[in-house]
Amino acid sequence: MKRPPNWFDLVKEIIKDFSDLDHQKRSFYGDEFFASSAAEMCAFALDDYTVDEWLETYYDKLPPRLRDDMTEFVEQAMELPGDSAYDTIEDCLYSPEWVKIRALATSLTEQLEHLPDPKES
């Protein structure tokens, strides 16, 4: 699969979406055609040439804290339980796992905001 030309911007947008509770609610309730479940959301975000491969590709060019936080984000996102682990969507969105992933994503969004695209450095 060919990497998207806007790979870095795509990664930033994916992480920003993970930090946004309202976006997640719209996604899960079907108001947006992003994902219909927590599992699909993770699969879309971590699939192909997005977050995990971007991290691997540019790992050595990233500041240490960002590198560590990105690694933790990818690991945590891949371990999120599927929707069947929760009684309701609200239980899912407010579970400790999802609260943690949103906090990580918020921190990453702030760190990535002014970071130049590593490929250009």
Describe the residue ranges of each PLM region:
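A generic alpha-helix propensity feature with a strong bias for hydrophobic helices
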Residues: 8, 66, 119-121
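Positions within ordered alpha-helical repeat solenoids
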Residues: 20, 79-82, 111-114
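Structured alpha-helical bundle/scaffold domains in large eukaryotic membrane-trafficking regulators
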Residues: 85, 113-121
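Short terminal alpha-helical segments
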Residues: 1-50
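Amphipathic protein-protein interaction modules
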Residues: 50-107
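Short, surface-exposed, charged/polar-biased interaction segments
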Residues: 32-36, 94, 98, 110, ...
